[in-house]
A protein has these predicted regions:
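Structured catalytic core of nucleotide-sugar glycosyltransferases
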Residues: 28, 71-74, 121-123
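Divalent metal-coordination and catalytic microenvironments
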Residues: 34, 70, 121, 150, ...
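Active-site metal-binding motif and surrounding structural segment of the metallo-beta-lactamase
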Residues: 48-93
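Metallo-beta-lactamase
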Residues: 89-142
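Conserved beta-strand hairpin/beta-sheet module of binuclear metal-dependent hydrolase folds
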Residues: 2-56, 133-150, 162-163, 172
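Short, polar loop motifs at secondary-structure junctions
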Residues: 47-48, 71-74, 91-97, 110, ...
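Cap/insert and terminal regions of metallo-dependent hydrolase folds
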Residues: 158-250
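Active-site environment of divalent metal-dependent phosphoester hydrolases
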Residues: 71-77, 95-96, 129-131, 153-156, ...
Length: 260
C-alpha cells in the first residue's frame, strides 16, 4: 500500500515538474519552451516550426500559446507557421510587419493581462530599436518568471520573481577586441548601445531588482563575437549571488516552483 501511495505521489510530482527548454538564443534564431507534462508555452518564433514540434516530442496539443517580443527575424520569422496552430500574443506592429492574419492572433497592450491555459501573462514595455516588450509569466507549477530580451533599458523592476531570463549580449571589452580584429564593424558599437543589454547593464538591472525569491538567472541572447559565457556567468553569480546559466541550444533547466 505504501509503495502504491509513493508511486502516486511521484507521478503527481512529475506532472508538476516545469522545465525550460532552449531551442535557440542568438541572432541566428530565438525560441524557448516552458512546459510540464500537460501544458506548454512557446517564447519567440525565431526557429523553424518543424524544430519546435520536434522539441515538443510532437505533442503540439499541449501548447497553450506563443509569445513574441518584437518584429526582428530572429524572434518572429516563423510567426505565420506558429500562429496557424497556436494563439500567438504579440504587438500589432509584429503582425503588421510580418503580414500575418488569422483568428489565433492576439494583439497585446503592455500592462494588460492575458491567459493561455494556466499561464498568466503580463507584457511590459522594453526599450529596443523597434517596438518591443518583455513578459511576466506566472503558472501554479512555476511561480513567476520574467522574460526580457533585446533591450538596452527597461523602466520597470519586479518583485516576487522566482525565475529570470535576461539578455546579456556583450561587454565593451570583447566588443572592442572584435572591432580591432576586424570581426565586428565599428559602427555596430553605436547600434548595440541603443538596442542590446551589456554585461554592466545586466548587472545594474539585477542590482536594482528584488532577487530575494529568485531561484536562478538565465542569461540569454549572448553575442557570438562580443561576449564570453563563462566570464559573464561568473560576474552575475558573484554579483547577484544566484545560480546562473547560459541559454545554450538544447539546454533544459528546471524551473519548477519552490516554496520557502
Amino acid at each position: 500500500m505504501l509503495q502504491v501511495l509513493q508511486l502516486i505521489m511521484n507521478q503527481i510530482q512529475d506532472s508538476r515538474l516545469m522545465m525550460l527548454k532552449v531551442l535557440g538564443s542568438s541572432s541566428k534564431g530565438n525560441c524557448y519552451i516552458i512546459q510540464n507534462e500537460s501544458e506548454a508555452l512557446i517564447l519567440e518564433a525565431g526557429i523553424k516550426f518543424q524544430d519546435v514540434k520536434k522539441a515538443l516530442n510532437w505533442n503540439i496539443a499541449k501548447v497553450k500559446g506563443c509569445l513574441v517580443t518584437h518584429r526582428h527575424g530572429d524572434h518572429s520569422k516563423y510567426i505565420k507557421d506558429l500562429s496557424g496552430c497556436f494563439y500567438t500574443l504579440a504587438l500589432q506592429d509584429v503582425f503588421d510587419y510580418r503580414g500575418v492574419t488569422g483568428n489565433k492572433l492576439v494583439p497585446i497592450t503592455p500592462g494588460s493581462r492575458y491567459k493561455c491555459g494556466n499561464f498568466k501573462i503580463i507584457p511590459f514595455d522594453a526599450h529596443h530599436d523597434v517596438p518591443c516588450v518583455g513578459y511576466l509569466i506566472d503558472h501554479p507549477d512555476m511561480g513567476t518568471l520574467m522574460f526580457l530580451t533585446d533591450f538596452y533599458e527597461c523602466d520597470y523592476r519586479f518583485s516576487d520573481l522566482q525565475h529570470i531570463l535576461i539578455e546579456c549580449n556583450y561587454s565593451d571589452k570583447y566588443l572592442v577586441e572584435a572591432i580591432n580584429e576586424g570581426r565586428t564593424f565599428a559602427r555596430q558599437r553605436d547600434r548595440l548601445l541603443k538596442s542590446h543589454l551589456s554585461l554592466p547593464g545586466c548587472l545594474e538591472f539585477l542590482n536594482t531588482s528584488d532577487l530575494s525569491k529568485v531561484k536562478e538567472i538565465v542569461l540569454i541572447h549572448l553575442s557570438s563575437e562580443n561576449s564570453n559565457a563563462d566570464e559573464f556567468v561568473k560576474a552575475v553569480e558573484d554579483d547577484a549571488r544566484k545560480p546562473t546559466y547560459v541559454a545554450y541550444p538544447g539546454a533544459e533547466i528546471d524551473i519548477t516552483r519552490t516554496y520557502d
